[in-house]
Structures are given as structure tokens and as C-alpha cells.
Amino acid sequence: MRLFVLLAYIIPFILCQLTPVLVASHKLVRGLKEEINPSNTLPHNVTSVTNMLKKLITECSSDAYLLINQPGLTYADLTTEKKDNWPFLRNYLYMSSTIVGLPRVENPIDLDFLEQYIISNCDAETINVWHDSEDEVVDYYDIRKRVIRIDLSPLSISNHDDRVKEIFEHDQLIRKILRKLPSAHYTIILTSLEPGIIHPVPRFLMEETPASFEIFDDIINDPFHNREIEKNDRFHKVEPNWNPIRDSNDRYYRNKKKDEIHLFDYELWEKNEKLITTIFVMVLSLFMMKIISFFNYLKQKIIQKKQQKSKRGIIADDKKLD
């Protein structure tokens, strides 16, 4: 009986499932690390990590958000030792203004919640990738933000060579998908809803050899690469050059509104100053002619009445004489 009790306490420390979370954004979002524990030696609380991601999303600084679920992924697949398996992802980390790597999170991140949070806060729509194919992301040219949900196939557990090959292929798939996007402003959130099994490691060992237990320690924990500076805005702020909306109801109503003529529009009056002046003079002339004509009419009526009165007076005098 004591043996079973002992095993019940020991087994959770022998094998455990902790989710890695890697965040990279083209644009700078300040203060993300204030939401989480600064040390990665202990597992992070999923609530604090979710709050950090909400802070990242709330600014809506990206035009596309890639929510990537890699079943079977562990932090061991993302260490500096495995950098050759992720050539594109690492290259993107070098270019990103915001990078956060959390090797161990207590529970999986709720990607469905994040998807809905992006949709409601950034007026986005979702594109799903379920079959490891970039063709599932159709070309688009409008300015609406996108949530790209990528559910990758599980990584091999038994065969190390197959696992390495699968990771490399998935890295290339991410590259191909990003190349299809019309904007370079995007955010990657890589995690696992079904993480692989890892062995617990003593805290002192993590502190002594962080490169073996951190996500790409040579980039993320390098002060030169992970400073809170905008790497992609060194010269001046330039908004992405979006293609115009094609065959869109929004565009129709916007153009219709532009075509509306408002009487009290200052620009309209300024643009048509000569025409308006001419019309005003013509209307004023017609008005003056009408007034003059009216006064002439009144004058004639008055003269006629006076003549009629004078005639009546003459007739009355003649009758008296008779």
C-alpha cells in the first residue's frame, strides 16, 4: 500500500506534459514580459500567459495572426541545439521586434479563445489550414485582418529522423504561407495543444545551462536581439501599401458617399466659385427685374385709380351745373 502511495507522488515528477509557447511579432508591443514570471525555470501559469497574449493582440498591430498548433511539440524541439531544424522561423525571430519564448507552460493555451479575441477586437476573419498545405490559404487583397489557424500533423515519437524531417517541412510550410500574405506585418504564436512528454529537470541545472532548456536561447535571451526597440521602423512610419478593395460593398457605399453633393460643403463652393457667382448674379438680376416689374405694376394701378377718381369728380361737377 505504501508503495502505491509513493508511486502516486513520484510518477508526476518522472513524466509531465508542459506546453512550449513561442511568440514573435513584426511590430513592437511593449511590456509583454511584465505580465509573466521573468524566470523560465518554473512552469508558467496559463492564465498569466493568456493575459500576455491578450495584451499583444489588443493593439491589433499585425495584419495577420498565425496561431500554430504543433501536436507533440516540446521545448526540447526548440532549443539552440535544434536550430538547423527551424531555419526560417529563426530567421523571422531575428527580424521580429517582439519575441517571447516560454519553454514550459502548465496547460495548453486556448487557441479558440485567442481566435475569437482577435476576431472581436481587430475585426478579423479566419483562414484554416488543416492538411499541411499552403494552398489552403487563398490569395486575398483586401485590408481586413486575418487569423490563420494552422493545425499541423503530429510529430513522430518513435523515429528521431522522421521527427527532424517533419519539423523542417513544417518550418518550410510556415514560410510558404507567410509569403502568400499581402502584408509583412504579422504575428506568430507557436504552441501545442497536445504537447509531448518531457522529464522534469532540476532548477539549478536549468540555470547553469540555459541553452539546453530555453527556446532558442541564443536569440531570445540575447539582449542585443531582444531589446524593446522597433526594428522595422528605423526611418519613418510607413503604412502597408494595400491593394484597393475589389467588388466590395464597403467600397461601393464609400464611393457613393463621396459622390453625394451637399449644399453646405465648403470645398464644393470653393471649387465652383465662378459658377456659383454667375448663378447668384443671374438670380439677383431676375429678382431685381421682378421687383421693378412689381413696382411698375403698382404704379400703373395707382395712376389708374387716380384717373378713375378724377373722372368721377368731373362727372359729379357736370351734374351739379345741370
UniProtKB/Swiss-Prot annotation:
Residues 296-322 are cytoplasmic. GO terms for biological process: (1->6)-beta-D-glucan biosynthetic process; adhesion of symbiont to host; cell wall organization; cellular response to starvation; filamentous growth; filamentous growth of a population of unicellular organisms in response to starvation; fungal-type cell wall biogenesis. Glycans are attached at N45. It comes from the Eukaryota. The keyword NAD does not apply. Residues 1-16 form the signal peptide. It is a single-pass type I membrane protein. Its main location: endoplasmic reticulum. Keywords: Cell wall biogenesis/degradation, Endoplasmic reticulum, Glycoprotein, Membrane, Signal, Transmembrane, Transmembrane helix. N-glycosylated. InterPro entries: Big1. GO terms for cellular component: endoplasmic reticulum; endoplasmic reticulum membrane; membrane; plasma membrane. Residues 17-274 are lumenal. The chain crosses the membrane at residues 275-295. It is found in: Endoplasmic reticulum membrane. Belongs to the BIG1 family. PANTHER family: PROTEIN BIG1. Present with 3460 molecules/cell in log phase SD medium. Required for normal beta-1,6-glucan synthesis, for hyphal morphogenesis, adhesion and virulence. This is Protein BIG1. It comes from Candida albicans (strain SC5314 / ATCC MYA-2876). The lineage of its organism: Eukaryota, Fungi, Dikarya, Ascomycota, Saccharomycotina.
